């Protein structure tokens, strides 16, 4: 299983980057004994100004061939943290590669949204794509702690 976080734009040094690195490090330490691989953070940039379509091409090229595509989109499904953990465990148990895709400031191109196996939402509000990375990294860590039976996730 490969687990990729594919995102448009590069995080500069600062609090968002620090948080993403912290949560992905925690995920790796917690997830490894559970058979979950370290997350590969793949950042793409459209330097030619081609917009969402060009970003979709770059994201598609970054993803592992045949990977389950899970996108972050405000029109997607809202899962609880335990439901997300269960989904992650199903992908792991099936040996599936997973690409979690976050679009740029304008979102994801319709053709990428249409081919997604799962569209996830952090609610009906629109979030800055840099914060979505932080939130997704935290939810990955939270999912690993749920699967490990750790007290981090309290209800």
Swiss-Prot record:
It is found in: Cytoplasm. One of its GO terms (cellular component) is cytoplasm. Belongs to the RNA methyltransferase RlmH family. The gene is rlmH. InterPro entries: Alpha/beta_knot_MTases (IPR029028), RlmH-like (IPR003742), tRNA_m1G_MTases_N (IPR029026). S-adenosyl-L-methionine binds at residues 71, 103, 122-127. Its EC number is 2.1.1.177. GO terms for molecular function: rRNA (pseudouridine-N3-)-methyltransferase activity. Homodimer. The lineage of its organism: Bacteria, Pseudomonadati, Pseudomonadota, Alphaproteobacteria, Rhodobacterales. Keywords: Cytoplasm, Methyltransferase, rRNA processing, S-adenosyl-L-methionine, Transferase. It catalyses: pseudouridine(1915) in 23S rRNA + S-adenosyl-L-methionine = N(3)-methylpseudouridine(1915) in 23S rRNA + S-adenosyl-L-homocysteine + H(+). It comes from Cereibacter sphaeroides (strain ATCC 17025 / ATH 2.4.3). This is Ribosomal RNA large subunit methyltransferase H. The keyword NADP does not apply. Specifically methylates the pseudouridine at position 1915 (m3Psi1915) in 23S rRNA. It comes from the Bacteria.
């Amino acid at each position: 299983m490969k687990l990729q976080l594919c995102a448009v734009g590069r995080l500069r040094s600062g609090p968002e980057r620090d948080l993403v690195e912290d949560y992905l490090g925690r995920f790796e330490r917690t997830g490894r004994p559970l058979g979950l691989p370290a997350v590969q953070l793949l950042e793409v940039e459209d330097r030619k100004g081609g917009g969402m379509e060009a970003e979709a091409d770059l994201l598609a090229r970054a993803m592992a061939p045949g990977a389950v595509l899970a996108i972050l989109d405000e029109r997607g499904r809202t899962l609880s943290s335990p439901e997300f953990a269960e989904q992650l465990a199903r992908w792991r148990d099936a040996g599936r590669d997973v690409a979690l895709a976050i679009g740029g400031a304008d979102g994801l191109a319709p053709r990428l949204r249409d081919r997604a196996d799962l569209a996830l939402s952090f609610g009906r509000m629109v979030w800055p794509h840099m914060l979505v990375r932080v939130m997704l990294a935290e939810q990955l860590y939270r999912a690993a702690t749920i699967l490990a039976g750790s007290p981090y996730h309290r209800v």
